[in-house]
C-alpha cells in the first residue's frame, strides 16, 4: 500500500511540475502586451507649453505664432478652451487669444 502512495505522489508531482511552466509563460506574454498598451496611452492627453516666455515670443514673432496656432488647432484646442490655459487678466494674453480666434476664422 505504501508503494501505491509513493507512485501517486510521484505522478502528481510530475504532472504539477509539467503544467507549472505554461501559466508563467502566458503571464509574461500578457505583461509585455500590457506594457505596450501603457506606452500608447501617453498620447491621449496632448499638452501645450504655455510658459510665459513662449507666449511672449508668440506675440512678437508672427511666424512662430502661426506655427503654434497650427499646432493648437491640430491638437483640438478651441478658442473657448484657451481661457483655461491663458491668464486672461493679462491684456497681452487676451490679445493672443483674440489673434487665435481670428486665425481660426480664416
UniProtKB/Swiss-Prot annotation:
| Residues spanned by motif Bipartite nuclear localization signal (NLS) | 56-69
Description of how the protein assembles with itself and partners: Interacts with host PINP1.
Q: What is the effect of changing residue 100 to A?
A: Abolishes the interaction with host target PINP1 and lowers the size of lesions in leaves after infection
Give the originating organism.
Answer: Phytophthora sojae (strain P6497) (Soybean stem and root rot agent)
- Motif RxLR-dEER, per the record, lies over 33-46
UniProt keyword list: Host nucleus, Secreted, Signal, Virulence
Question: What is the top-level taxon of the source organism?
Answer: Eukaryota
| Reported effect, residue 39 to A | Leads to the transition from disordered structure to ordered structure and abolishes the function in cell death activation
Gene Ontology cellular-component terms listed? extracellular region; host cell nucleus
- From the Swiss-Prot or TrEMBL record, give the protein name: RxLR effector protein PSR1
Q: Where is this region: Disordered?
A: 29-65
Q: Tell me the protein family, please.
A: Belongs to the RxLR effector family.
Domain notes per entry = The RxLR-dEER motif acts to carry the protein into the host cell cytoplasm through binding to cell surface phosphatidylinositol-3-phosphate. The nuclear localization signal (NLS) is required for localization to the host nucleus and RNA silencing suppression activity.
Cite the residue spans of the region called WY domain: 50-106
Outcome of swapping residue 32 to A: Leads to the transition from disordered structure to ordered structure and abolishes the function in cell death activation
Query: What is the stated purpose of this protein?
Result: Secreted effector that possesses RNA silencing suppression activity by inhibiting the biogenesis of small RNAs in the host plant to promote enhanced susceptibility of host to the pathogen during infection. Interferes with secondary siRNA production by associating with host nuclear protein PINP1 that acts as a regulator of the accumulation of both microRNAs and endogenous small interfering RNAs.
Enumerate the Pfam families for this protein: RXLR
Mutagenesis or variant effect for residue 72 to A: Abolishes the interaction with host target PINP1 and lowers the size of lesions in leaves after infection
- Residues making up the signal peptide according to the UniProt record: 1-20
The record's section on InterPro entries has:
RXLR (IPR031825)
